[in-house]
Structures are given as structure tokens and as C-alpha cells.
């Protein structure tokens, strides 16, 4: 009886350990996508005003108002889109949308073009960050929610911190347009990672 009881206790403990195991292989791609997203977004928040001034545009602050509208609007419809199309597919599509928006920001010649691109850029950024946070919490054991939130904020903060320094150096040597081209390239890396993850784990 004692032996049987000990075996059952060990079995329950093993099951609990399995439940609390974190599968970092499936989590690493959303974390990296968030990092690249923050890296690129730091280029926008830090340098789009200076970029607009260098092009002779007035009222560059309007960019951030339109950008914020895009971010807010994504919160209202992303949940329905994720349910309909799938988590990773929407992560992929928003990374692609952010790539197109940021690349075209590097091509603008008129202020209205910059304002037009602020909306999809804001939508993509506003969609990716909450998705990754929710994904991490859902995929980690309930007892590890603290790790999920810490990982989320670490990826975001590191992206912004590195971006602010790196983009400043690039701007000094290559100009503002190059910042946005390279920022867009970061999103292509995210797209490739999403495609690989979807294929390996057959995710939607």
C-alpha cells in the first residue's frame, strides 16, 4: 500500500512537471517577431519626425496621431480576425503589412503619403504586440505567467533600446531613408520565421 501510494504520488508529480514544461521552440518565433517589430518601431518613433523635416514636410506630428488611430483600430478587430484566420497567419500578415508600410515610408516624397502609411504601420504594430503577449500566456503553464509577461516586456524593451542606438548610427552614416529600408528588412526576417514555424508545427 505504501509503495503503491508512493508510486501514484510520483506519477502525479511527473504529470505536473510535464504540464509546467515550457516549449520554447514554439514560443521563440513570436518572441523574435516582437523583438524585430519593436526594433523597427523604434526607427519610426525616434526618427520619423527628423526624416519628415529633412524632406521639408510641415506638421510631422500628425503622423503619430494617424499612427495611434491605426493601433487603436487593430484592437477592435484583431480578435475576430485571429479566430477566423488563425494566430500565426495573422502574425505573418501583420509582419508583412508592417514591412510594406515601413519600406514605403522610406520612399515618400509628399506629406500626405507619409500620413497615409502611418495608418497601416500603426495597425500592424498594434496587432503584433497584444497577440504575442496573449500567445505567450496561453502557451505557458498558469504558474509561469510571470515568465510570460517578463519575456514579452524584455523582447519589446530590448528591441526599442537596441534600435534607438543602431538607427542613430546608421542615420549618421547613411541617412534617414536607410533606417526605414533596414527596418523593413527586419520584418521580412519575421515573415520567414513565421512561415517556417507554420510549416514545422502545422500552425494556422
What are the language-model segments listed below?
Residues 169-187:
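A membrane-interface helix-boundary motif in multi-pass transporters
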